[in-house]
Every structure is written in structure tokens, then in C-alpha cells.
């Protein structure tokens, strides 16, 4: 019997997509499900960006673009990095892809050889370890619990480094926790990395603009780190453009050239119309970005305050993104009389089936004691969801 490759067989399916699918199935049955499992803004793409896309269609931007993306888009990204982040790049140091997910995967693929180790702080985005495994590398997971705000320390980083370490994947603001590394915390990690000059940092900054503490901090801005850091970013979260699929890397030219070589053999350049929309996003008014950020901050305050009232939940105060990641292991071993809650995935399924609230268990994020809730939804949905969760958990003894 013909079988799929061992490489594919080793991959785990996406837990976030699986929960979203299960939620959709219940909704199709007419059940009122509040979906807190979705990792995308609930806002619409700003009108001026949509108008730019319409114009691109009328102007016949319908052919292949350069593999790395149109020069106009890459120049707009160069200007964004200089004006917003104080970082100097050239267009040759930018490569655009079909979303930031592909940008991360591209970078992993061009850096990692079989047996190489990639350090991944946990909790992590579910796809990071799978990308490393796809490249036949070894994910080295460094756990950071809620007591340290889900952020690793310099000592933990130092202890994880071996002669096989090729890269560190660092996500700030974080999916799934919403934690944000301060400038001082990044400097501490950088001091460790400077002792190991061959390690590349893959800095996933896709949630840069959904930030509640002020200026975004990039590890690339620290002296000595820019030439060994690959910034990953894109338009999906900040501009409510998840379906447009435009991400990018900014980094050393030798890595960018390798990424272009790889991408040229399996997807080529990203969608031409989406690129023109992304160009408009970066060069146009940033007021919609700030309006969405303010709405997310208000929702963050609401869900944190409500979740603190749920017995057995331990809650931090996320400083970015749009996720809450409460510790819920208090409920492990409890039962409603028909089922036993053994782990976070059991709890997430219980909440979906009983409370009709979709969350994602933390096991796939490297944190089996937590569940992820997205507050990229209305204030009314947030309030009702936490009420349902509280009522459902009260039935567990």
C-alpha cells in the first residue's frame, strides 16, 4: 500500500484549525457557539486598502510578480521598518511570502539541517515545532510558566544552547499568551546570544501593532543583533488582512537570497493584487490600526477582569496580541458525572460541548495546564462566553 512520506507522518495536525472546524460543525447544526478559538481579527479590512486592491485589478496587476515581491511593496516595508522601528534595510533584504506563516517556514527551511536544534520557548505557536520537524531538525522546548509571565530567562536560554543549536524562534507579542518581552528582557537574551555568534534569531513580530505597552521592542534593534536576526511580520493582524496572505522577512541578505531561491521553486511570488493592497496598508493612514488596537485593549481589560472571577483560573495580564491563556489545571481530575477532565484538551472539548464556547487546549502550544481564548470578538460575546464557562465549570466536582 502506498503511504505518505515519513516526513509528513511525523507532523501533528493544527489544533487551532481542528477546534475551529469542530465549532463550525456545531454551528451548522444550529447550535449557538461562541468561538474564542479563532486567531484573527474580527474587523474588516480598511476601505482604503480594499480600494487599492480594486484599482490593482483594474490596472491589470494579474501576472506573476518577482519571487520576493514587487519592488514597490518591498520599498514600503523598508520605509516602515525605518520609520516605525528605527531599522535600516534595503529592498534586497526583504522577501514577501504568502503570509507570515510561510515566512517563518521559509526561514526554518533554509537554515536547518537534519539534526540541527532550534530553541522554541513554550508556550509557543503550534506550527513552530512542526516546521522544525519538517526541516528534519530537533525542536528544543524551553518552558516558561504563568509565574514568569510565560517568558524565558537568560539563564534558561543559556542552558538550552548546545553545539547543535542553529536558531531561536522568539514571538513577541506572543501567540498564545499575549506576553510581550520588554527592551530589558530582550537585552538580557541578547547578551547570552552574543556569546554564541552562530545562532540566528527568527523574531516573529506579526502582532507588533496589537501592543498595549507603547513602543514595540525588536531584538533586531539591539546592538550586534540585526545581522543575525530575521524579522517576520506582515499585514494579517494589524490591518485585519488574514485572508490576503502577505507576510515578509527582513534580514541578512544571504538568508533572504536563500529564501528567494527556495520560494522560487514552490510558490513563487505572492498574490499580485494582495501585494498592492499591502503596499497601500503600509503607505496609507495608520488610524484604523490604532482604532483596532484600542478596541482590543478594551476587550483585553474586559476578559481579564471577568476571567479573574472564574474559580480555579490563574490569569496573567497580556500586554499584546488578542489572547488570554489562563492556567486551568485546577479542574484536572474533576468530573461532571459523565466524563473526567484529564487535561486542557479535555477541558476545551467539555467547554465546547457543554458551554458551547470554543477555546483551544494548551497541549499543542506546549502548555498542557492552560487553554487559549481569543478575545477577537465583541464585548457581548466575551461577557456571555465567560458566563457560560463559569456555569459549566461549576458542574465539575
Regions found by a protein language model. Give the residues of each.
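Conserved N-terminal alpha-helix of the aminotransferase class I/II PLP-enzyme fold
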Residues: 64-97
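PLP-dependent class I/II
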Residues: 2-4, 8, 12-14, 19, ...
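A glycine-/small-polar-enriched, mobile loop at the entrance of the PLP active site in fold-type I
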Residues: 37-40, 55-73
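Glycine-rich phosphate-binding segment of PLP-dependent enzymes
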Residues: 45-64, 78, 83
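Generic structural signal for well-ordered alpha-helical scaffold segments
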Residues: 24, 78, 82, 108-109
Amino acid at each position: 500500500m502506498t503511504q505518505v512520506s515519513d516526513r509528513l507522518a511525523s507532523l501533528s495536525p493544527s489544533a487551532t484549525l481542528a477546534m475551529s472546524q469542530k465549532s463550525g460543525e456545531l454551528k451548522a447544526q444550529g447550535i449557538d457557539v461562541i468561538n474564542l478559538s479563532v486567531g484573527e481579527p474580527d474587523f474588516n479590512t480598511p476601505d482604503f486598502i480594499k480600494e487599492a486592491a480594486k484599482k490593482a485589478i483594474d490596472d491589470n496587476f494579474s501576472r506573476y510578480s518577482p519571487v520576493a515581491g514587487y519592488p514597490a511593496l518591498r520599498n514600503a516595508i523598508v520605509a516602515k521598518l525605518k520609520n516605525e522601528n528605527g531599522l535600516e534595510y534595503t529592498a534586497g533584504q526583504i522577501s514577501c511570502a504568502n503570509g507570515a506563516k510561510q515566512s517563518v517556514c521559509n526561514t526554518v527551511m533554509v537554515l536547518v539541517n537534519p539534526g540541527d536544534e532550534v530553541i522554541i520557548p513554550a508556550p509557543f505557536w503550534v506550527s513552530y515545532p512542526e516546521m522544525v520537524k519538517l526541516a528534519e531538525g530537533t525542536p528544543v522546548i524551553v518552558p516558561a510558566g504563568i509565574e514568569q509571565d510565560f517568558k524565558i530567562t537568560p539563564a534558561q536560554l543559556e542552558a538550552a544552547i548546545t553545539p547543535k543549536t542553529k536558531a531561536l524562534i522568539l514571538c513577541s507579542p506572543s501567540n498564545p499568551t499575549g506576553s510581550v518581552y520588554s527592551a530589558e528582557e530582550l537585552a538580557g537574551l541578547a547578551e547570552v546570544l552574543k556569546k554564541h555568534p552562530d545562532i540566528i534569531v527568527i523574531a516573529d513580530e506579526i502582532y507588533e501593532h496589537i501592543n498595549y505597552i507603547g513602543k514595540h521592542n525588536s531584538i533586531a534593534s539591539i546592538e550586534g543583533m540585526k545581522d543575525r536576526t530575521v524579522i517576520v511580520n506582515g499585514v494579517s493582524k494589524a490591518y485585519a488582512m488574514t485572508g490576503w496572505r502577505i507576510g515578509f522577512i527582513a534580514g541578512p541578505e544571504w538568508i533572504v537570497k536563500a529564501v528567494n531561491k527556495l520560494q522560487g521553486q514552490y510558490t513563487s511570488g505572492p498574490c499580485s493584487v494582495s501585494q498592492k493592497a499591502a503596499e497601500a496598508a503600509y503607505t496609507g493612514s495608520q488610524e484604523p490600526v490604532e482604532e483596532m488596537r484600542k478596541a482590543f485593549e478594551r476587550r483585553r481589560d474586559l476578559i481579564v477582569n471577568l476571567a479573574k472571577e472564574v474559580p480555579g483560573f490563574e490569569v496573567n495580564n497580556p500586554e499584546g496580541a488578542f489572547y488570554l491563556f489562563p492556567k486551568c489545571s485546577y479542574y484536572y481530575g474533576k468530573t461532571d458525572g459523565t466524563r473526567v477532565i484529564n487535561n486542557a484538551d479535555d477541558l476545551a472539548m467539555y467547554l465546547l460541548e457543554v458551554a458551547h464556547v470554543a477555546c483551544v487546549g494548551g497541549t499543542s502550544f506546549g502548555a498542557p495546564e492552560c487553554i487559549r481564548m481569543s478575545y477577537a470578538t465583541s464585548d457581548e460575546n466575551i461577557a456571555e462566553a465567560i458566563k457560560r464557562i463559569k456555569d459549566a465549570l461549576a458542574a465539575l466536582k
